[in-house]
Amino acid sequence: MALRFPRFSQGLAQDPTTRRIWFGIATAHDFESHDDITEERLYQNIFASHFGQLAIIFLWTSGNLFHVAWQGNFETWVQDPLHVRPIAHAIWDPHFGQPAVEAFTRGGALGPVNIAYSGVYQWWYTIGLRTNEDLYTGALFLLFLSALSLIGGWLHLQPKWKPRVSWFKNAESRLNHHLSGLFGVSSLAWTGHLVHVAIPASRGEYVRWNNFLNVLPHPQGLGPLFTGQWNLYAQNPDSSSHLFGTSQGSGTAILTLLGGFHPQTQSLWLTDMAHHHLAIAILFLIAGHMYRTNFGIGHSIKDLLEAHIPPGGRLGRGHKGLYDTINNSIHFQLGLALASLGVITSLVAQHMYSLPAYAFIAQDFTTQAALYTHHQYIAGFIMTGAFAHGAIFFIRDYNPEQNEDNVLARMLDHKEAIISHLSWASLFLGFHTLGLYVHNDVMLAFGTPEKQILIEPIFAQWIQSAHGKTSYGFDVLLSSTSGPAFNAGRSIWLPGWLNAINENSNSLFLTIGPGDFLVHHAIALGLHTTTLILVKGALDARGSKLMPDKKDFGYSFPCDGPGRGGTCDISAWDAFYLAVFWMLNTIGWVTFYWHWKHITLWQGNVSQFNESSTYLMGWLRDYLWLNSSQLINGYNPFGMNSLSVWAWMFLFGHLVWATGFMFLISWRGYWQELIETLAWAHERTPLANLIRWKDKPVALSIVQARLVGLAHFSVGYIFTYAAFLIASTSGKFG
């Protein structure tokens, strides 16, 4: 018999039903559960898959560069970044005839094209690329790296080049290499690129391989570095009248601390960013020499952790046993990595709009909105994944003997207190926030808006004032001209920073009021509830009051019947599943808030947000309904415009989203009957019956139906909002 899918599980491969396909897909990446798996093969498989991941990333970025160079308008855009619309790629076959061809022919193109809302034009422009040839060169280089990664992945699966388990578990060496090599050297290399290529390009000088060794990035060369006069590199910065990309108003400084934004591009000063990356490089190069390896210098991580013991009393045994627990559990390590990456991704979303790094991106409103939303959603999925793998760690890898009375064991011991406190916080936030919104709704409905309960966010305003925002009149720290903080920074970065924070045209420390106070607490409710579900799922993964032997059932089990007092929705997988809905819900509120606040800021009618955001009807009517009107008219009986593709995606997103409910709510047996009916008809239809269906259709399991439902719900939800966001923003601002 030929080998059937899945080859990694012979038991499953012999299943005669459609379960074979479903369970095969579900466990394809669960290397630990595969036939004949050893610890060594497990680590080697994961290591090899990292190379594949890198190859895909390089191929994808290469494709972006290639298509823009081939079908885009980069060279035209560079001449006038504020008025030329950047083209992502051509549309081969625009449907709906001539009106569609005309609607999608824009950005100076000869035929129908898609506009780029990813910010790649601004990014490439800022780092010194100027011609299509530059883009092609980059695409080829990344293609080469992609091929190299694939070869690397293949090579490390060959017997001679397979790393051993001891190599994977050498935490000190890995940390040193990642800190020094990955972060330190790459930050230093990036500083080099900014100083040698990007900063000259911003001053109208074209540095490439042919003149790279002849052009001094600074008039004094390396002199100041060797004589210790580093301050010379900061002298003569670009002036406030500097025209980006030209020598007009440019200086010679390469490492500065100007603060604030370049007046024309509204982005951070390139010389400030070079300085920042140099500082990061030095920090990480030093950090990468902290841990003891073959050379016998530096710290042992195990010794560090074992030393973390509370001085006495009832505080337990601190970090004892943690080193081996973490070092021997891939799920623990993945959980930590995902938690960190999730937070960083969310910070990227926040900082990309408030402190834009790329020239002119702040004036490209649709791109700003798209990038913020994109990074927040990705952060949400990554963060929920951290808790999922934390739960799997507790089920598969946690050893109570190794962790007796340490911080991990104590988390499990007082999980009831943790969960009940989170529950209380969520209930408090939910009832109070909804209560305020509903009260305000009723007051508006009765025609007495003055009876709304409007709370000024005075603590947040005080924090903004401490950072230098003067409009609230708090006169504290940086907003006070007499304090030591003000005097310390007055001669360097402070004037630029204060100028930026008090100018109302950018997104740095936006003015906040009662509407912000309310939506802030709605978001806090979402964050706390999501966290509650995830934390409870992980802490209860090994066992709970109703089901003390839960760990014997694995990570994802559907139901253990009514005999235990009802154990549906009780596996760690169920907690992850429920949390994803809350995560999407929360990020929905976050992105609604960000988008509406910014639309009113960009249109110059902030009072609309301030007045309408204090009650629910305001959000429904003045944000969602008002901003979807253009989108819904992308095409209608009278014709179509360039928003039609978003109008279609908006409808399609709703369809996918609604399909999710068929799997989430419906009786699952219906699917078995449906598929069997389709299979029956298929087998009795000429031509179609040449292809026989070998597997007997069976109903989806509870867990499978939930997964399929969740996937459709998530994808549909994000598709719908993406279309709404891009159409409503680009429809207003072009």
UniProtKB/Swiss-Prot annotation:
P700 is a chlorophyll a/chlorophyll a' dimer, A0 is one or more chlorophyll a, A1 is one or both phylloquinones and FX is a shared 4Fe-4S iron-sulfur center. It is found in: Plastid, Chloroplast thylakoid membrane. Phylloquinone binds at residue 671. Its EC number is 1.97.1.12. It catalyses: reduced [plastocyanin] + hnu + oxidized [2Fe-2S]-[ferredoxin] = oxidized [plastocyanin] + reduced [2Fe-2S]-[ferredoxin]. It comes from the Eukaryota. Chlorophyll a B3 binds at residues 662, 670. GO terms for biological process: photosynthesis. It holds the Pfam family PsaA_PsaB. SUPFAM superfamilies: Photosystem I subunits PsaA/PsaB. Chlorophyll a B1 binds at residue 654. [4Fe-4S] cluster binds at residues 559, 568. PROSITE patterns: PHOTOSYSTEM_I_PSAAB. Keywords: 4Fe-4S, Chlorophyll, Chloroplast, Chromophore, Electron transport, Iron, Iron-sulfur, Magnesium, Membrane, Metal-binding, Oxidoreductase, Photosynthesis, Photosystem I, Plastid, Thylakoid, Transmembrane, Transmembrane helix, Transport. Belongs to the PsaA/PsaB family. NCBIfam families: psaB. PsaA and PsaB bind P700, the primary electron donor of photosystem I (PSI), as well as the electron acceptors A0, A1 and FX. PSI is a plastocyanin-ferredoxin oxidoreductase, converting photonic excitation into a charge separation, which transfers an electron from the donor P700 chlorophyll pair to the spectroscopically characterized acceptors A0, A1, FX, FA and FB in turn. Oxidized P700 is reduced on the lumenal side of the thylakoid membrane by plastocyanin. This is Photosystem I P700 chlorophyll a apoprotein A2. The gene is psaB.
